[in-house]
């Protein structure tokens, strides 16, 4: 075990888990689970996500960065590019004390993009990760994921697919920059926001955001339903290489969004 891994494991052992862990699943037994990033420098990402408020945790051999509602996983790998240009353009978090968080980011030298709204903007993460931020003083925790933003050519079709497959609730989600609402599908843990793209964007595999993870209770039964509905299952039920209590599978949506289905990702 190298020094960086040892430090990460020690921090994980001492860390107090962030409020709860993942959201209570919906009627389809699905909730947001994780976001998996392919990165050039794991240590740089550990530093970045710590600055965002993440806490290192371990599920046996699986190192993760925990936020309320989601785990961030990082893996060293070559990529085809950042999030912009892929069907998943960015994802977003809300901070209870945004001015304090922004002061920390500025001290660390991270690039911040804002318009006239002091309560909203974007931060440029390593490897072309685009992260949206907003302030929400009503939060019960310091920071929480609030959405993943997808850009299909056909928004109603994508809404219908995620509603049927993941049991999400379609509607409008209100954001700082869109008070009238953005088309979305609500999944426990976060909104899947959807905006129309004039062209078909790149699929996520091989990008810095390689895939989105959803935690599923009773994964074998869920996969049987996926087969019956004709969902593209790219990898069937498989034991995890990192945790004996976890099993995984992979599916892909019709727009090229790679998704990992997990059961047992939480420590």
Language-model regions, residue ranges each:
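Mature N-terminal segment immediately following signal peptide/propeptide cleavage
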Residues: 26-60, 64
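N-terminal secretory signal peptides that target proteins for export/translocation
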Residues: 1-2
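Vicinal oxygen chelate
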Residues: 20-27, 30-40, 63-66, 81-150, 172-197, 214, ...
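Well-ordered beta-strand scaffold positions
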Residues: 70-71, 190
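Amphipathic alpha-helical segments
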Residues: 40-56, 101-108, 154-170, 228
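N-terminal post-signal-peptidase region of extra-cytosolic proteins
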Residues: 74-77
